Amino acid sequence: GTTTDTGRKTAEAIIQANPDIDSLIVAGGGGDVLVGANAAIEALGLVGKVQTVSTDFLPDLDVKLENGTMAAESGGHYADPFFAFLLVYNAIKGNYEVPTDGFYEMLFPYMFVDSPESYANYAQYFTGTELPYYSDEIAELADMDFDALNKACAALSVEDVVARHAK
């Protein structure tokens, strides 16, 4: 199963089998596996020596980035439901033709954080009281054709939101 204990035991086994390890990618299983892997690295005294990255944001990610337990993180699947909704909404509005023998493909970006500051910005604009887009920006997105909407989706990042909100 994907538990904290499994994550810890797996990380310990990987580290033991690879004593010169300098990085670890923890993926799958939600945050529990990552919590266990971090516990193993901390218990073995390898914080800052083994750079860990993952795709599961933890509630204490800012602390883990600050103390060197985590090197970077991607995640924050905000774009998935938001842009999926906009695709359907724009199709209903007639902003672009709906194919009957194909589909539109939009690749949703993961959010990336690699410092306590970038995580604080993510928390503020993606999980806090502020949203990544202001209401006027959402109205603009709702009027875009597919290519423009796809470009807006691809541009979404923590840095993009911070820059737009700073205006």
What is the predicted role of each segment?
Residues 16-17, 70, 166:
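Extracytoplasmic/cell-surface-exposed regions of Actinobacterial cell-envelope-associated
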Residues 87-167:
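Hinge/cleft segment of the Venus flytrap/periplasmic-binding protein
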Residues 8-22, 44-51, 74-78, 97-104, ...:
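Short, Lys/Arg-enriched charge-dense amphipathic segments
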Residues 51-116:
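Flexible loop/turn connectors
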Residues 2-63, 85:
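Hydrophobic alpha-helical
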